[in-house]
Amino acid sequence: MSTTTTIPGAAPKKKRNRIPLSCTICRKRKVKCDKTRPHCNQCTKTGVAHLCHYMEQNWAQDAKKEISKDNELKNLKERCKILEEKLARYMHNPAVTASLGASVVNSPVGLSSPVDAPIKLTNSPMVKLEDDTNMVDDMARPVKEHDYDELDLTRQFDLLHIKSNGTIHLGATHWLAIMKGDPYLKLLWTHIFTMREKLLEYYTNGSGHKRRKRQKNGGKCPIDHSKFKAAESEQKNHFVKTTPMVNDTPKSSIGKCPIDHRAMSNPVGVNSNAGQFQPMHPPHTHIVQNKCPVDHKVNDSNLTSANTDNKNAATKKCPINHSKYTKEKMQGAGLNDKPLTKQEVIEKLCQLLPPKRIIMLYIDKFFKHFYPVIPILDELNFKNNINQIFDLNSLISNTIMSTSSDLELEPITSMTLNKPTDYSNLGILIIIMRLVWLSLPMNSCKIDIENPLLNKLRTDHDFKNEDYESGSLASSLRLKDELQLLKYEVDGFALDLVKKHLIKFDEISSISNTNVNMSTIQFAVFFKFYLMNCANASSQGNSAGNFDNESHQILLSSIMMMAFSCGLHRDPDNFPQLNVVSANLTTDNTRSGPPSNSNRNGSETPSVSPKDTNVSIERAKHTWRKVWYYIVSLDVQQSLLLGSPRLIRNLNDISDTKLPSASKIDYVKDIKELIIIKNYTLFYQLDLCIVAVLNHTLNISIAKNVRKFELDALISNLQKLTDGEKGINDVINSLINHGLLSTSEVPIGLQKFDDIYDLPRMEDILLARKSEQEIVGDENERIGQDVDKKLDLPHEMTSKALFFSKHMTLRMLLYLLNYILFTHYEPLGAEDPTTTILAKNYAQKALDYALDGYRNCMLYFVGVSDQNPLFKYMNVILCFHSLDIGHRALQFIICLILRVKCGPLNGLKETQTIFGTSVPSSCNSSSVEDENTEEPNNLNQDNQFQDDLMQNINLDNSDSLAEKLMSRMVLFKQLTEKLAPKYSFSVRVMKSTGFFISLLTTPSGSFGSKKNGSKHKHGVGKLLLSNWKHPKISNIPALLSSDSDQLKKCPVYQDALGFMPSRPSVTNLPSISNVEGLLPNAQANGRMTPQLPPIRSYQPITYSSSHMRVTPNSESDARKLGPDSHQVTNPLIPSPLSPANQQQNQVNVLHMHQQRSMSPAPMPMMNPTAMTTNQNMIPERKYAPHSGAATPILPGTNSDIQQQTQMTRNDPYPTEQFSLPPISSAKNNMAWGTTPESEQGDHLTPNTTTSSLDTPDFEDFIIQNSNFNGLLINPNSLAEAMGSLPSGRDGAILNVNSFKDFTTSTNDKTITPNSADQTDLFSVDMASTDFLPIDNFAIDGFMDSANLDIGSIWE
């Protein structure tokens, strides 16, 4: 027998570095692979064909390049053939030929050569897809006829938000753009902004002085006076029994609040020195008091004689909990004082960070459940770096550390921070620990709403509070770890310390890039992700207005510039020197890692084999590619949310970085990373579909004249993708072949994608829980079975949750595209009845996808609450996205409710509605609703039981449409109330939803009372008043005929719609010969150019009131506030006017369009000089208010409409200090047919006394703003939603915190927030956050006109 001898000192035999031929999954499962491409039979049988992956051979790279060139040439030939066929079909279309001939005739230049026309056609998308020809027969003719209609999305949906400190542009995909594109929402928001400004002016002119006084006293008292009063009453009883009659305590101190409110008198948001408005403090930012605000002398004097009793002795303590103030003071001192040294920062961090074992548990939990959401780290490298910083000897191990008590309690005493990358890794670790702690199932928000719709949704999807691993050993270990993590919350102040004092991120991202490296970019991406999803968890106290990504727009641009400076846009294979650097970094990390068994004696440093070095180099390149494509995805996501252009466009022109799937890594030891690269490829393909939509809606060159068939093609492809009828590769190829997606958006070499790893259907994702329960049983039962069939369950479930999010995004785009086409064709029904069919079809599709987004939003939050495994750790990461989808759906629901309740808009000729009703515009819109609203009283109850969230709603069922949609709004309001304590960005959504609910239902103010409600034809629960229209309200829908060039400031009141038919001819206008330059275009075509009425929305109500029955300089004739007053209180009955007043007073310009006749009166032309400019808004206190310019009554208006004067106001504050200067001028008077002499007697002189300046009470304000196209709306609702509802007729304003007592009556039910566990939130966040994301100062300098502390009313 021969023996093999080993020569001492001989080098070990070098192993062959051969690329395996079997797939990764078969080698992992240790089964024989048949090597079938692209997917082997073993993987197909076991159900993991989508994960079958082969490593590429090095020698096959050159051959692959040659094959790819041949394939590319073949694809180009096929594409040219398709384009030629489309061009021939395009030229033979009669409609296209006619439109092309018309465009040539109307063109001022014409076609210079016959070649120009084909070139222009070949550069644009050709025709509609063949798949779209299978439409309904009755829709075939309109589709063919209107295929080449052009839409200008840059004009209809672009929004410029003008703030007091700057401007923000919001594009067509932002959720606010819908209120500008829809005519009903546009007019409603215009009315709301008018009411808002008047309400602000009403507060300014004395009615809010009590509120301002309370605000100057420091807001809410930090003492619970209920307990204090109980102790005081008990103390008085004790005094009666035990103390003598003589009491030296001053009477002024008895019962006095012990808080020294003068110490808290500095108002938030107002600079008392400069008198200018300052940015508001965030909701969670508390002012650090220098001393205790409790007046302890008063407190001691009240309770001195009670020290004999132990119970009363306890009351001598300060009633304020100083612990939180001490903590805030410490944190504030660390950030606001002088810069801290590195050693001081490390000492503070050691106190804030948890023990070593807890840190390791956080990291393991992140890479097991959260890593697929933001996979830009290399797990092995990151753990090595953290081990180097904290000396965690067992961190590199993949197994759970032993639960030894000494290791578990071992705190962090020191940190090793030797290089700048350590700072970034430390910051990433803190963000990871914050995300994991906030996402623990125990921290999820419980949705315990008793609603029939929600209960049925739970029943249909079997959402129960049970774990898919219940009873198993893994479940008990997981629960134990999570309970342990729950005890160690990492303070967000630690992140601020690292970001400001170690990384110095503000300097790096703004002025310097000397310290930018890969770790810095990774930290910046993590920080943006943290701000997007955990804004309320940041110690910096981000306001609730930051949830929609506007505040982080510049942060992403900084990240992108840092990525360009590091060269991430170039593939790392282009730079051979990266191999040496990556090898050195790998060697350093390995040496600094945990000691191995061979190095226990410390004899020598462990050597790194060349194979390990090559693997490390490839992993570094892999991380390079992952970071770059994640930044590209963030750019697409931000563009979709904000409607802003993408920062990285035509990726193929600026970048050659390969997808992470091109990395030469063997994933047999890390199957989780294999899922990551599959997700990267799929998500990038989905981003390409989103890019195709963004190009047609946001790119000015395309969106300016986008054609209907292009949008139809996008809708068809996205619909087939979401329904599972087409794969993602087929959709992308279809978009490219039909010119909807440029090839420059697809990087070179990425045209060949995986055909199997596709987006699953939504039904399969939601049913994944049952399939997983069937596969994954008890731990003991799984022994001996094929446990590798699903490979890694947590990553699989997290990926499916991400698929759910992608489905919501794609379906939101389908809703947006259908909504755009619906709003384009809806108003054209008066001229072309065929467009009504198109409009109704698009409206139905938009409603279906809106309800689908709403339904998925509810499914997500219910699943999080019931701990569905699909969303078990996604309660923070997907919360904002789901809430945004539901909020967008709610906007369209409001659109439809307005159409059902208001009917066709006034001011139009023959209006075709989407509900199949043709109504003459001259008829009152309320009469249409009278037929539909005559329903039995139990209709609502029947629909409540028949309604189902899983079913779509048909627009033809207009009888119950509004009530079904309203029930969904009510449920969404209840949902946001439950989310508000945990997620600050849901506060604004909740207030906006509550505002519209209170606006569209009978308000709880004046019109909701039993006295007035009993006189209404439809009672308290209905929205309309039968055939009643307020005689003094203006005809708001006349704004539809306005021009777009004269409104400059208000983000909704600008760029009025330009799709209306031409106005009546000039011959119908009254004689206005004294107007200079009024008709610049009338002589050319004989028609009146659409012009806008004057902007009077910012004119104070006290200056141009239209329903105030008081004679000037007569306090005796003012409205009496006593019980013996005989004034008419019913707002539906206008008070009669005397003949003298009818002859003396004239109609105000703002209210001259309202009519009682059957046909609308023509509007006068307006010179641009008649517009209110910014100079008119500058306050000048030496002027007094005016009563309004005199205006002649136009033909067709009711002669009973008269201009009234102001009412006497009973408050001690003079009006001169709050007044605005007169906005009328000589040009304005001439433009409206008046002379300066005609209004000299109407204006008040600066010497006018206070008694002659009249202010209306709140009911007059309500009556003046009560009608929107026949729909009764109440300005009380605006005050309710803002949390400052006036009480009674005296104009007293309730406390800001009264919003927590806000109730909404709808469908005979009352919704009341749970104030028991949300008191602090409602008292802080809701009072300081407006329900509108647009601030109150749409015109620069408007705040200066008041110069008062009223900012907290809106902000």
From Swiss-Prot:
Top-level lineage group: Eukaryota
Function: Transcription factor that contributes to plasma membrane sphingolipid incorporation and membrane permeability, decreasing fluconazole accumulation. Regulates 337 genes under fluconazole stress, including several related to lipid biosynthesis pathways such as RSB1, encoding a sphingoid long-chain base efflux transporter. Associates with the promoter of RSB1 in the region containing two 5'-CCCCTCC-3' motifs and increases its promoter occupancy upon fluconazole stress.
Pfam families in alphabetical order: Fungal_trans, Zn_clus
Record-annotated membrane-spanning stretches: none
Protein name: Transcription factor MAR1
Species: Candida glabrata (strain ATCC 2001 / BCRC 20586 / JCM 3761 / NBRC 0622 / NRRL Y-65 / CBS 138)
Subcellular location: Nucleus
Segments for region (Disordered): 586-614, 918-942, 1221-1253
Coiled coil: none
